[in-house]
Each structure stands twice: as C-alpha cells, then as structure tokens.
Curated annotation (Swiss-Prot):
Pfam families: Pkinase
PROSITE patterns: MAPK, PROTEIN_KINASE_ATP, PROTEIN_KINASE_DOM, PROTEIN_KINASE_ST
Cellular compartments annotated: Nucleus
Organism: Aspergillus fumigatus (strain CBS 144.89 / FGSC A1163 / CEA10)
Gene Ontology MF term list: ATP binding; MAP kinase activity; protein serine kinase activity
Stored SUPFAM superfamilies: Protein kinase-like (PK-like)
UniProt family annotation: Belongs to the protein kinase superfamily. Ser/Thr protein kinase family. MAP kinase subfamily.
Enzyme class: transferase
Gene from which this protein is expressed: mpkB
Protein name as annotated: Mitogen-activated protein kinase mpkB
Regulation affecting activity: Activated by threonine and tyrosine phosphorylation.
Length: 353
C-alpha cells in the first residue's frame, strides 16, 4: 500500500509498505534515503522505516548491502537492529528497499547542539558506544564512520550505533586501495593514519573516532573541524603536538613523513587547558583514545576497563560477537567487477533469504 507522510514543501515522498504499518512523520533524510516514523498496527509498536533508493549508484548499493547484512548479523543492545525488511512483490518491480527498525527519538549530534551534557551523561554514552564497538571489533568488523549523528538515543538515554554502510572486515587481506575512494566519512572524526597512509587501517581508527566524540560531548563543539585534508591534520597536530621520532617513523608512507617534516614544530596542548571544567578521569581516557600513533592507542577492551567508566563497567555484561564468516564481504572484494544489476540481485537475494 502506498502511503504519504504529512509534509511541508513541494516534494512528494511515498512509502510503498505493508498495510500493517501506518506512516506518520518524516524524521530524517539522507543522500539516498528517507526515514519516517510509523506504527506497527497489530502490536501498536512505534518503528522507524528507512526507505532507500540505491540503484542509481553502485556505491549506494554496496552501502545498502553492507548495512543489511551487518545489522542482521549483530544482535546487541547498543547496535540498531532491523526488525523487518519489506519483501518486494517481484524482482521486476523491485526499486526501493524498506528497512523497519527500532524508533529512536534523537541522535548525539542533535543532543550536543541543544544541551550541555553532564559528566554522568558523557560516561554513560561513551560506555554504551564502546560496548557496541567491543561486539563489532570482536567480530572483526570496523565501523569506519563513527560520529555523533550515528549514535541514536532515546529518552531513557539508551544509545544505539547505526549506519554500517562504510563498515568492512578488519581481517581484510586486500590493501584497502578502494578505501579512500568510497571513504566519504565525515573528515572531523577521521584518524590521522587515514590521511597519512593508504595501507593499513586497524580497529584503532574507530577508537580515534570515539575520542573525538568524547571531546565533543565535553565541550559542546567538534575538536577537529577540518575544512579539508591538510587543515584536518593541522588541527590534530595543533593539539597533539609534533609527533615524536618513534611515531614519525611509524608512518609508513614516505610522502606523508615528508609532509609532516615540512610543518613547523608544535608543542602539545594539555587537554586540561582545552577542557578546564572536565573530570580528570575523562581527560585521561581522552588522552589514551586520541594517541597519534594507532599502535599506542587504547583498545576498546582497555577503554571499557578505564576508571572513568568504572560506574558502568561489567565484564559479564559486555558481550562479544562471533567473527564474521569467511566470504561475508565477498561482494566488497569484487565490487569493481559487479554491475549495478548484479548488485541489485545481491540486495534482492539478501532481502528474500
């Protein structure tokens, strides 16, 4: 049944979903999708329905496929789940994907913009983010696009990580050469190694993003709001200071090393000077999350055990997930060889399985 949410403006949005759902309001729009709130009439449950029209671009198809496969794979309190996927009538008429998900009231980006967060809030939100990340990393999955708008929240302060469209396997044997072409993740939360070398990306890139999010929660504004690639690195080094010799030689790319060497020497700014009102333990964790050298950055498990998160840490209630099976990301390895039609078939098969 085709339904149209009430909307201002001239653009019409129609949702072709089962009569079990009553569409209510548009709650979000992205490059290739619209999210509406709805009611599942048989149960009275409020849900979010994400309508995706990915078939114009291979990249959107790949993101949709990753999102569906991974959200179905994880079953975790702090990762958004797919309650249902609308099954198309047939392949011929299949040109939209409808994901039915839990309805969350807001996201971290909106919350940070509209209110000051207490230290308790910061603790609880970072704890839940790391709890989700522990499951992802134990499954050998990198999220790669952690940022405040991808942390969904409800009135209970429950947090769920969403948007797995850029995720990939940490055990990936390819050289990540396609990584940057598709890597449109928000620059502000990108780890320095992503800009300084094109070879190895590890779980530490997600840990860096968590550090950027914690800093933003503490101050209410982004820590490294770079305008472009060079500006981004400059902002990072303005705070962290010029890398030590050991960290400098840890950078794989010679070109990247030469670029760093060409920059003026900078002294580190203590986080206490940037966040004078913040809890000392929060700043100690921040220091460890935002280590310039990925090899020295704290792991998710270590971060969960950090004294700042002690009020919430419970080793018996921080579940891991099984490693993703061999072949789970095969479509990604062959992505350049797959036509849009082949990708559409893969998405159709994933929905119908």
């Amino acid at each position: 049944m085709v339904q149209q949410p009430p909307q201002g403006g001239s653009r019409k949005i129609s949702f072709n979903v089962s009569e079990q759902y009553e569409i209510q309001d548009v709650i979000g729009e992205g490059a290739y999708g619209v999210v509406c709130s709805a009611i599942h009439k048989p149960s009275g449950q409020k849900v979010a329905i994400k309508k995706i029209t990915p078939f114009d671009h291979s990249m959107f198809c790949l993101r949709t496929l990753r999102e569906m496969k991974l959200l179905r794979y994880f079953n975790h309190e702090n990762i958004i789940s797919i309650l249902d996927i609308q099954r198309p009538r047939n392949y011929e008429s299949f040109n939209e994907v409808y994901l039915i998900q839990e309805l969350m009231e807001t996201d971290m980006h909106r919350v940070i913009r509209t209110q000051d967060l207490s230290d308790d809030h910061c603790q609880y939100f970072i704890y839940q983010t790391l709890r989700a990340l522990k499951a992802m990393h134990s499954a050998n999955v990198l999220h790669r696009d952690l940022k405040p708008s991808n942390l969904l929240l409800n009135a209970n302060c429950d947090l769920k990580v969403c948007d797995f469209g850029l995720a990939r396997s940490a055990a990936s044997t390819d050289d990540n050469s396609g990584f940057m072409t598709e890597y449109v993740a928000t620059r502000w939360y990108r780890a320095p190694e992503i800009m300084l070398t094109f070879k190895e990306y590890t779980k530490a890139i997600d840990v860096w993003s968590v550090g950027c999010i914690l800093a933003e929660m503490l101050s209410g504004k982004p820590l490294f709001p770079g305008k472009d690639y060079h500006h981004q690195l400059t902002l990072i080094l303005d705070v962290l200071g010029t890398p030590t010799m050991e960290d400098y030689y840890g950078i794989k790319s010679r070109r990247a090393r030469e670029y760093i060497r060409s920059l003026p020497f900078k002294k580190k700014i203590p986080f206490k000077a940037l966040f004078p009102k913040s809890n000392e333990l929060a700043l100690d964790l921040l220091e460890k999350l935002l280590a310039f050298n990925p090899a020295k950055r704290i792991t998710v498990e270590e971060a969960l055990r950090h004294p700042y998160l002690e009020p919430y840490h419970d080793p018996d209630d921080e579940p891991t997930a099984p490693p993703i099976p061999e072949g789970f990301f095969d479509f990604d390895k062959n992505k350049d060889a797959l036509s849009k039609e082949q990708l559409k078939t893969l998405i159709y098969e994933e929905i119908m399985r």
